[in-house]
Amino acid sequence: MNTENRQPAPDRPHQTARTESVKECQHRRPLVSTRSWLAAILLAFASPCLADSSAVWNLNPTSGNWNTAANWTPATVPGGVTGTARFGVSNVTQVSNSSFVAIGTISFSRGASAFTITGTPSNGISFVGQGIVNDSGVVQNFVVAADQAGGAGTIVFTESSRAGRMAQFTCNAPTSVGTGLPVIAFEISANAGSAIFDNLGGVTSGAIGGQTDFFDQCSAANATLVNEGALVTGAIGGMTYFVLRADAGHAVITSKGSAVGGGGGGGTVFESTAKGADATLIAEGGNNGGGGGTIQFWDSSDGGLAKVRVSGNGNLDISKHSAAPIRIGSLEGDGPVYLGSKRLTVGNNNLSTIYSGTMQDGGTNGGAGGSLTKSGSGSLTLGGNNTYTGGTTVSAGSLLVNGTTGSGAVNVDAGTLGGGGTMTGAVTIGTGSGGGAFLAPAGGTKIQATLTLQSGLTFNAGATYTYTFKARKKKAKSDKVIANGVTINSGASIALSGQSKGAVTPGLTLTLIRNTSVNPINGTFANLPDGGIVTINGNNFQANYGGGDGNDLTLTVVQ
């Protein structure tokens, strides 16, 4: 497994020494200290000195300092659960805090100026009420800052506060190793609304990037989040974490790759019992030797209906998941997928997608024996050369293999297996306890295909082989299955579908199954006995289970 350009997500013990190499950063994840900081905020807010008050930012304030009472009307610094800071037209639109701010609502009135409100290093802004209400008609900017002295700002949404709409958040990266963490955090039941969040990549070797965290029962809602790649060698990209029962809602979350050799890509991580919900999760590749973005599922998290898209060396990694299987809605793109020893179930959102990357064992947590299950009513087309060593299961919809599956066995419990690729492991169609399992090389398309099985093929009772062809006079294009040994158990059937232009020349032979084993085909389809004649589009075909080189299933046109 090539992991040269793949940057793992940082682990989460306390923020102590940050002089490790980028690879060592994977053993650290800075959320514990983040929660400690949030606890301090709540204690501070509980203090009686934080009385509720509301005020309007002046047209001509004396400075851009939030904490200067003279900048407001009435001359009081707004704060508290029911407190509202109102912004309209002003000649000073760069606003920052010199001490901690706890505010219920920041409101931008219709026609208000475009503001930039910055949480300065070592000072936080906490929304403890409604959150942000923007009626101005323009985007309002919020910035989490960091400085060379190690200070880091923070913006926190807690209780049921909302980030609102037409709001742009930028979370800067620490400017040195071992310093405070700039973070945007959502606590209790807050959500991100339809805001935009940009977590900037690391700017110092060994340091992390900006970070947005969702805790408890918070949701990313309809937000757009971008985790940027690192800007220097040895740094880590911006990150988004979902922890406890938080979910990604309907958000679009993009983890970008780094454009610098040895720089880490951005990352999105789900842990505890967090959920991908109905989000779109994107991991883009890096350039110039930079690491790709990453999407990771840890612990007992669940991908739900999330649409996962990976490209370049941008990757999906489930190797740190502790439960089996881990579900996602759909998978597409050409980036690697790391399974470790886990089972990935794809298809819960019923979409039809094409994945042409490499699905493989390994990942940040290592492990072998990874496996794949296709679920849902849509189709998943595998176009790459997959190397995972566990099995492949089709439980619903269609799995179309135009590349390769892993080396394990392939079982179709329900749904359709097809394509023109290659499978290493033994293939079994049906469970023997009911219908609904199909082998169909064309996979419901109008293009005939040859599916190659390097091991044996078994049709159980209730299974169906769907075979299609197009014929004209002496020529034909047809499906074909190549298998190293074939068993057709009692109760399996074949569905024949052909298109022909006029009468087909007698003697034309179609090979339905090419058996590469020295042994004959064991059994016959219930509706196609050996020597039986079937009529398709006015042409008569005779079945032969000893055709071809003596042990293939063929149909020959007869008078």
Walk through the language-model features, giving the residues of each.
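Sec-dependent, cleavable N-terminal signal peptides
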Residues: 1-53
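Fold-core signature of tandem repeat domains
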Residues: 169, 184-186, 197, 212-214, ...
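Solvent-exposed adhesion/ligand-recognition segments of exported proteins
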Residues: 5, 45-194, 198-209, 213-220, ...
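Short structural boundary motif marking the start of a folded domain
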Residues: 52-56, 342, 370
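Tight coil/turn sites that cap or link beta-strands
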Residues: 111, 137, 147, 166, ...
